[in-house]
Amino acid sequence: QLVAHPVWATQAMFELNRAQALNALYAEQDRASTSAMAATVNAWFERDAELTEMYHSIKGGKWNRMMSQPHIGYVYWNNPPANIPPVVQTKALAQPAVADMGVSVEGSRAYWPATGGLSLPEFTLYGEATRTFTVYNRQGKAFNWSAKASQPWIILGKNSGELLADTPVAVSIDWSQLEAGHHEGTINVKGTGWGGANIKVTAHKPELTARPVSGDFIEADGYVAMNASEAKVKSTPNGSWHKVAVHGRTGQAMSAALPPYSSLTHQQAPALEFPVFFTSTGEFPLTLQLSPSLPFDEATGIKVAVTLDGEHVATLALPSQKDKQAWAQGVMDNVKELTTTLPVTKAGRHRLAVKALTPGAVLQRVIVDTGNLKPSYLGPPQRRAP
C-alpha cells in the first residue's frame, strides 16, 4: 500500500513508455524484433492493470477504487475515459523464412541498408569508454555476420557470430596507440546483402600539458556537468551554502544562507567552487539549474554571480515572480535555468565558482556546453577524475 505499489506502478509505467519508444524506433529501422517489442508494451499495460486490482483487494477491499482514475493515454490535461492501450507497430515476416541483415548505431535513427553511411558518436579521451552498434535481423532466418575494423586502435567486443535477433557490439578505443589529434577509421559489417555496412569511427585525443587531478570535473563528450552538492563551499563572514537533502533532480541541492535582505558583491559573497578540467577552449554556453524560488525582497530578487579563476564572468537573476507562465513552467520542471557565456582561453585546470549575492538561491547543477551537448530533459551525467 505505502511502499510496494508506488515502486511497482512506477516501474510499470516507465517500462511501458520505454518499450513503446523502442517499438517505434525498431519499426522505423525495419527490425524483425518490432513485434516482440510490441508484445512487451502490451505485457506492461497488463501489468499495470494487475497492480491496480492488487491494490483494490488490499485488506478485503479497504481501498477499493482508489486507483481507478485512468492514467494511460493522456493527450491533454484531462484524463481519458479509460486506460487506453498504447499504439504499437508490428512487422510481418516472409514465409518461408529468409535472412536480411540490418545495422544501426547508438545515438541515431539511421540504419543500413536504408542509409549509406553510419557514424558512431565521437570518442573523447575522458568520455564514454564504449560505443555500440547493433547487427539485427530484418526477417526470421538466422545468418552469420562478421565485423572488421580498419585501424588497430579500434577494439571490437566481438567480431563475428550467428544471429537470429538483435546483437549489440561494443566498440572501444586503445588510446595508447593514438597521438594527439583527431583520428578516423571504419568498421565494415558483413552478413546478408552486397558489400555490407560501413560505420565511421572518430576519436579525439587532445594535446595536453597537464592531467586532471582526482576529483576534478572533466570535460567529456562535448560538455562538463557538475552537481552543486559536490562543490566545495567557501563561506565568508556574510554567509554560506548549506546542503538540502532529497531535493532537486540530482537528489541534493545547495541553498544559499545569507541574512535576509542582504545584497553582496561577488568579492563578499559565499561561493560554491568547482575544480574543472577543460580539454578545449572557446566561448562556451553555461547553464545554472536552480530550484524555483521566491525572493525575500522583490526589489533585489535572487541573484548569483559566476566567476572563473577569480575573474567575474556574469551576474544572473531569476525572473520576477510576476511572470506567472515562467513560474508555472519552473514548478513543473522543478528547475529554473539561467544562462551565460563562459570564456575559456586555455585548456587544463580552472576554478569555476557560483556566488550567492542575495538570499534565496538553491543551486542544483551547472552545465557547460563545450560543443556537443545533446538535448535531454534531465541533462547529462557528470564525470569526475578518479
Predicted stretch roles:
Residues 1-141, 223-234, 238-245, 254-263, ...:
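Catalytic domains of carbohydrate-active enzymes that cleave complex glycans
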Residues 107, 117-386:
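Extracytoplasmic
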